[in-house]
Amino acid sequence: MTKREPDYLAGHTVLSLNFIRALRDVASEHQIPYLSFDVEHEVEFQGQKLTPFMEDFSLDYDPVATLAHVLSAADKRPHVISELILHPGFLDQFILQHSHLVYPRTLDVEMATSGQAIEMIERHDVQLVRYSELVDSAKA
């Protein structure tokens, strides 16, 4: 579809051991970095430590409070990448019928595009990083 290999493979949507093994095998076979998923533990990706934060499953989810939590963690552990996992984006019929994150997705978009979020990020002097940038830095 994109006429190039993906920058990395990750599969947190389907929590199946067989799926995860298959995804790791495909990543290995095609020499594509694999990003493991564990919201309860630090993970390593391309030589960097990542601490994931995904709180949008809670009933009282507040993405601004989650961002504040992530920024506080980043201040305390600057040598570790604090990974804020959001689910913003397009809502099609399949997602509307099957996702538990329909409402949190709208909250994520609102927060991620808000002036308040930008100001919070700037105040903490946080550098936003894409996974592809971690892949590129590991190759260098």
Model-derived regions, located:
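Histidine/acidic-residue-rich catalytic or RNA/ligand-binding cores of hydrolases
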Residues: 20-21, 45-47, 61-63, 92-101
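Conserved, mostly hydrophobic/aromatic
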Residues: 9, 84, 121
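C-terminal domain-boundary segment and adjacent tail
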Residues: 98-140
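Short acidic/histidine-rich active-site segments
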Residues: 83-91
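Short amphipathic alpha-helical segments and helix-helix/interface helices
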Residues: 20-24, 68-72, 117-118
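Structural motif
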Residues: 33, 80-83
